[in-house]
Swiss-Prot record:
InterPro entries: PFN, PFN_euk, PFN_sf, Profilin_CS. This is Profilin-1. Pfam families: Profilin. GO terms for cellular component: cell cortex; cytoskeleton. The keyword Cytoplasm applies. Gene3D superfamilies: Dynein light chain 2a, cytoplasmic (3.30.450.30). Keywords: Actin-binding, Cytoplasm, Cytoskeleton. Cytoplasmic distribution in hypocotyls. In root nodules, it is found in all cells, but is more abundant in the vascular tissue as well as the endodermis.
Length: 131
């Protein structure tokens, strides 16, 4: 299965009539493995900030989580495993696997819990596969 299939079928799936707005799977170096068509362009320093927060949880909280220049307020995540951000009626979930970052961006009417479930479920599956 290609990485794009994981994005198209597992991240952009429908859940209770809702879909993620954007989704991507990136290498931990920031290389794009697969993404939705309109996923924002990451800046190298944004990937560095995310990886630093996974290695030293809490480092993003004072400055915010940036994806494609958009700032998200960091909210409760799972240290070293999941970073969650909120911006207005939407937000983002970033799940770290052994080799990758699984990212989902949502907007209303999707809920934070729905986004978390989709992103973390795929991330957990990839971890089980050694990825």
């Amino acid at each position: 299965m290609s990485w794009q299939t994981y994005v198209d079928d597992h991240l952009l799936c429908e859940i209770e009539g809702n879909h993620l707005t954007h989704a991507a799977i990136l290498g931990q170096d920031g290389s794009v493995w697969a993404k939705s068509a309109s996923f924002p362009q990451f800046k190298p320093e944004e990937i560095t900030g995310i990886m630093n927060d996974f290695n030293e949880p809490g480092t993003l909280a004072p400055t915010g989580l940036y994806i494609g220049g958009t700032k998200y307020m960091v909210i409760q995540g799972e240290p070293g495993s999941v970073i969650r951000g909120k911006k207005g009626p939407g937000g983002v979930t970033v799940k770290k696997t052994n080799l990758a970052l699984v990212i989902g961006i949502y907007d209303e009417p999707m809920t934070p819990g729905q986004c978390n479930m989709i992103v973390e479920r795929l991330g957990d599956y990839l971890i089980e596969q050694g990825l």
